[in-house]
Amino acid sequence: MANPVQLFRRNSSWQKGVIRSLATDIIIHGRITTTEARAKILRSYVDKLITQAKTDTLASRRRAASFLRNIQLKDGKTSLQYLFASVGPKYKDRNGGYTRIIKLPNRQGDNSKMSIIELV
């Protein structure tokens, strides 16, 4: 069994970069297709980001800004502004469980377990 801390078998800076990019993508797009291992790790990070976005304070904005990538959207907002203006209020009455993982058939090239992770 693989060490859960080092699930990707890469160094920690690479893991953090991949998780940050995937978390930003799921906040912006609402759903992404990735491997099952990445989706399971990503779920906890996205849930924590949305929980912080529900309480719109300066401290929670700074905490989320330290993790999310600063991507400019088409409507002029950044990914952080979108998280706090659209995603956070959407889940105001929900206590956790903001994401869903749907399993897909294995990838054809290397037979990796694939899944879709999406916001509920």
From Swiss-Prot:
Record's keyword terms, sorted: Ribonucleoprotein, Ribosomal protein
Pfam families according to UniProt: Ribosomal_L17
GO cellular component: cytosolic large ribosomal subunit
GO biological process: translation
GO MF annotation terms: structural constituent of ribosome
NCBIfam families: L17
Subunit structure: Part of the 50S ribosomal subunit. Contacts protein L32.
UniProt similarity note: Belongs to the bacterial ribosomal protein bL17 family.
Descriptive protein name: Large ribosomal subunit protein bL17
Organism per entry: Mycoplasma mobile (strain ATCC 43663 / 163K / NCTC 11711) (Mesomycoplasma mobile)
Lineage of source species: Bacteria, Bacillati, Mycoplasmatota, Mycoplasmoidales, Metamycoplasmataceae
